[in-house]
Curated annotation (Swiss-Prot):
InterPro entries for this protein: HATPase_C_sf, Heat_shock_protein_90_CS, HSP90_C, Hsp90_fam, Hsp90_N, Ribosomal_Su5_D2-typ_SF
Region described as C: 562-634
Signal found in the keyword field: no
Annotated spans, A: 1-344
Species assigned in the record: Vibrio vulnificus (strain YJ016)
Protein's recorded name: Chaperone protein HtpG
CDD domains, sorted: HATPase_Hsp90-like
GO terms for MF: ATP binding; ATP hydrolysis activity; ATP-dependent protein folding chaperone; unfolded protein binding
Localization (cell): Cytoplasm
Assembly notes: Homodimer.
GO CC list: cytoplasm
Family membership: Belongs to the heat shock protein 90 family.
């Protein structure tokens, strides 16, 4: 390999997260240890992609060696397996940065999710992306020799570690550009010091890699016996998978390519591969993962597609081709219309980009529509993983609001379960005659929603109510105002009107009761003063004495909680206090002549209503004093 040791050797400690990852990986991924080869070959392929990209503006980086590839060789006598590439290579600073630290945000959050349960942890670690560190699954020591393209031969670097607490790094001379990774195999890793085992793994994981992957093999004589002469034999097809005809690609190949582009260990849920010719010429290969990325809700989560231009790799995580609510989509887009020197800044305001973004978005939504229609169970698997981010869609993607809304799922009073299985389409199909609104309720939890006093009249009248209890739901409903021509109506708002479901006799009786009860309403308002916006009677309740509601255009309880949790200033919510004149406790309050005792009744009923609505009250002691006083009197 033409390397000679130079100088400037130093010993450095691993970042603490690296130590933790190495330990967990060796134990959690042991049963699937062959993935180390997929990871290392994938990294080598990425290094070739990066060299191609940089060489577009600086062809001298090829150093008269533009035939890029990956080569594997092994030495049974020395127990070593070597993976070599002639890609971009690394400088000393890059070696320390890439091989000594984990340059990811949210690393601590990732480790906190680990359960010490092997199957779950291996899945999480796979999502995190182990890359280079997977070498330690089969090796008790790893040596890296690398030189960055464009640097002098004497600016190469040697990195070595036994995968424990530290590593060494030193300057060497290396004539060839690129990286050699030498694995000093463990006893239980020696199965990979075998040509046929390596062929099997490469065929399984790396057929789709766009550069040749070759293995060193002995030349056989005329009788078929091995000689001392060796040659390099290409093992993979070395054709970019997305450039092949769909009919020639097996499901297994699509699945392995997904693992290559996503560094996920699990198979994808579904995918879509399309070649489009016309106004824009491009190929897209889009995958829906089966599991949500562990850091999907992290603001710094990197998302986006791999971008190729005319089959030349340009960048990872090109987020411009997918809206934020579809940030879980993995895959690539290969455009013939973008310039090869395209940058993230150019992509931002590019008409081609906007056109491709619209097309890719519609492609993903169509995939999900078909899944929801044809495989309800599989769609529920998707919803459990990605439902929360899909609820960001109506606010972000006005053009596709109706499409996204049709994909949303909720709990409802129709289904006695916290599972979010009800579509808006199915709700509309079940609407009663005369019903022109979609009724919904937001709450802190399913239990709070299911047992809300606001539901009583809806249950009595057989009206279905959508139950929302995700933190994002109240925010969502600011943007999702109608579906299929039907307006949404919160059942906790003052403007709720169910009169179309009541007969004339019932309406007349309510009017009489309201007039009879007017003096009680005025006494209550006089006692409470400006603590509430208004006091009035309600006939929407059956078993509950009182509730609080907000005006149609005033901030609701759940939105106030959402803003407070985000650390934002929240204006005071002024509630309307509604009392049920048919309830025994309200009648007792109405019959109370003593104003002090009447006030205690008001405190108890308002306290109950606030507790049911908000889950808390501003002055619990006042509430308890009123209860104790009434109980003592009783």
């Amino acid at each position: 390999m033409n390397e000679t040791v130079a100088n400037n050797k130093e010993t450095r400690g691993f970042q603490s997260e690296v130590k933790q990852l190495l330990h967990l990986m060796i134990h959690s991924l042991y049963s699937n240890k062959e993935i180390f080869l997929r990871e290392l070959i994938s990294n080598a392929s990425d290094a070739a992609d990066k060299l191609r990209f940089q060489a577009l503006s600086n062809p001298a980086l090829y150093e008269n060696d533009a035939e890029l590839g990956v080569k594997l060789s092994f030495n049974e006598e020395h127990n070593t397996l070597t993976i070599s590439d002639n890609g971009i290579g690394m400088s000393r600073e890059e070696v320390i940065s890439h091989l000594g630290t984990i340059a990811k945000s949210g690393t601590a959050e990732f480790f906190s999710k680990l359960s010490q349960e092997q199957s779950k942890d291996s899945q999480l670690i796979g999502q995190f992306g182990v890359g280079f560190y997977s070498a330690f699954i089969v090796a008790d020591a790893v040596t890296v020799r690398t030189r960055a393209a464009g640097l002098n031969a004497d600016q190469a670097v040697l990195w070595h570690s036994a995968g424990e607490g530290e590593y060494t790094v030193e300057d060497i001379t290396k004539e060839s550009r690129g990286t050699d990774i030498i694995l000093h195999m463990r006893e239980d890793g020696k199965e990979f010091l075998n040509e046929w085992r390596l062929r099997d793994v490469i065929g399984k994981y790396s057929d789709h890699i766009g550069i040749p992957v070759s293995i060193q093999t002995r030349v056989r004589d005329e009788e078929g016996k091995e000689t001392e002469e060796v040659k390099w034999e290409q093992i993979n097809k070395a054709q970019a998978l997305w450039t092949r005809n769909k009919s020639d690609i097996s499901d297994e190949e699509y699945q392995e390519f997904y693992k290559h582009v996503s560094h996920d260990f699990a198979d994808p849920l579904l995918w879509s591969h399309n070649r489009v010719e016309g106004k824009n010429d491009y190929t897209s290969l889009l995958y829906i993962p089966s599991k949500a990325p562990w850091d999907m809700m992290n603001r710094d989560h990197k998302s986006g597609l791999k971008l190729y231009v005319q089959r030349v790799f340009i960048m990872d995580d090109a987020e411009q081709f997918m809206p934020s609510y579809l940030r879980f989509v993995r895959g690539l887009i290969d455009s013939n219309d973008l310039p090869l020197n395209v940058s993230r800044e150019i992509l931002q305001d590019n008409k081609v980009t906007q056109s491709l973004r619209g097309a890719c978005t519609k492609r993903v939504l169509t995939m999900l529509e078909r899944l929801a229609k044809n495989d309800t169970e599989k769609y529920q698997t998707f919803w459990k993983e990605f439902g929360l981010v899909m609820k960001e869609g109506p606010a972000e993607d006005y053009a596709n609001r109706e499409k996204v809304a049709a994909l949303l799922r909720f709990a409802s009073t129709e289904v006695d379960s916290a599972e979010q299985t009800v579509s808006l389409e199915s709700y509309v199909e079940r609407m009663k005659e005369g019903q022109d609104k979609i009724y919904y309720l937001t709450a802190d939890s399913y239990a709070a929603a299911k047992n809300s006093p606001h539901l009583e009249q809806f249950k009595a009248k057989g009206l279905e109510v959508i139950l929302m209890f995700d933190r994002i739901d109240e925010w969502l409903m600011n943007y999702l105002t109608e579906f299929d021509g039907k307006q949404f109506q919160s059942i906790t708002k003052a403007g709720l009107d169910l009169s179309q479901f009541e007969d004339e006799q019932e309406k007349e009786k309510q009017k009489e009761t309201e007039q009879e009860f007017q003096s009680v309403v005025e006494r209550t308002k006089s006692y409470l003063g400006d603590r509430v916006k208004e006091v009035r009677t309600t006939f929407k309740l059956a078993n509950t004495p009182a509730v609080v509601v907000t005006d149609d255009f005033e901030m609701g309880t759940q939105m106030a909680k959402l803003l407070a949790a985000a650390g934002q200033a929240v204006p005071e919510v002024k509630y309307i206090f509604e009392i049920n004149p048919n309830h025994t406790l309200v009648k007792q309050m109405a019959d109370e002549a003593d104003e002090e005792a009447f006030g205690r009744w008001v405190e108890v009923l308002l306290g109950q209503a606030m507790l049911a609505e908000r889950g808390s009250m501003e002055d619990p002691s006042q509430f308890l004093t009123a209860i104790n006083s009434l109980l003592t009197k009783g």
